[in-house]
Amino acid sequence: MKPSILEKLQQLGDRLEEVTHLLGQPEATSDMDNYRKLTREHAELTPVVEVFQNYRLAQSDLADAEEMLSDPEMKDFAAEEIEAAKAKIDELDTELQKLLLPKDADDDKNIFIEIRAGTGGGEAALFAGDLLRMYSRYAERNRWQVEIVSANESELGGYKEVIARIVGLGAYSRLKFESGGHRVQRVPATESQGRIHTSACTVAVMPEADELEDIELNPADLRTDTFRASGAGGQHINKTDSAVRITHLPTGMVVECQDGRSQHANKAQAMKVLAARLNDAQKREVQAKEAAERKSLIGSGDRSERIRTYNYPQGRVTDHRINLTLHKLDFVMDGDLAEITDALIAEHQAELLAAMGD
């Protein structure tokens, strides 16, 4: 392990002692904001320091085993102990480097997920509906909540565009690599000749802004239009101009919300989506630069990139960024995404570790 990393770990250990001392003071709870901040820092530092303690213990075991080598009667035993200690040190070294990777401040946040039908017309809209169900089922598996924010339904079923909000700790960390082009190959229900068609959808995953203050929205930059909501919602929703369209004039971004029961609710939700989109645009600009520097295919924020193909006749899913192919399409479409998301996170961590070593 590099001396600079060892020094950093020692500093973290010292800081944990300091934070523990501060939390133990009688006046610690007099400033609740600072108390919460210290508690959060304590929770973040503890696992790193514990692994570092185990690392130093393994190093001590290695030194003890090497001393035993000089004893002829203990030589074989010592050799086994040395091998075990070295393996443990390597394992803990890797774990420590992962723990020291820079944290994405958005990882624990709720998300907005936008799914837009692309090439393929009605079939693409149906696939957008399938993707929404896939992410909704994945959310259920994680005990997250799903709310439909805005939906532009297709005449044949599915969606031309749908925006959902997923509420749950770590939602962004698990789904942030889903942004990009998703392609489906299958025989449409309307196809009488049994020919396979290719359709596509674009997915955008955006962390929800903590507060609207995170993004400075100048009222002069916004144009708000109201109109009558269409689609489901009963009699009341179509009698008033409850739907809201907000246009961000500097960027041309347009957000529509009409699924709420009032104009006020729709405007509030539209502002949240707009804030998330503006935050996301800034984040993707930074990600693209960082990804280009390390020649990364994951986390580049490039929405035009085709990231995954769902082939129904062959029952397979292929993620093109990491050359991962799974022959369990039905399970994936039912929300069994863990194998894919785990592999993407692992690859992203490996890229960051490689960058740390450069």
Curated annotation (Swiss-Prot):
Report the residues modified as N5-methylglutamine: Q235
Its predominant location is cytoplasm
Question: Which keywords annotate this record?
Answer: Cytoplasm, Methylation, Protein biosynthesis
Query: Can you cite an annotated GO cellular component?
Result: cytoplasm
Which SUPFAM superfamilies does its entry note? Release factor (SSF75620)
User: What InterPro entries does UniProt report for this protein, alphabetically?
Assistant: PCRF, Pep_chain_release_fac_I, Pep_chain_release_fac_I_sf, Prokaryotic/Mito_RF, RF-1
Q: What PTM annotation applies here?
A: Methylated by PrmC. Methylation increases the termination efficiency of RF1.
Q: Which GO terms describe its molecular function?
A: translation release factor activity, codon specific
Which subcellular locations apply to this protein? Cytoplasm
Q: Name one Pfam family in it.
A: RF-1
Role summary: Peptide chain release factor 1 directs the termination of translation in response to the peptide chain termination codons UAG and UAA.
Q: Which family does it belong to?
A: Belongs to the prokaryotic/mitochondrial release factor family.
Give the protein name, as stated in the record.
Peptide chain release factor 1
Q: Name the lineage.
A: Bacteria, Pseudomonadati, Pseudomonadota, Betaproteobacteria, Neisseriales
**Primary gene name:** prfA
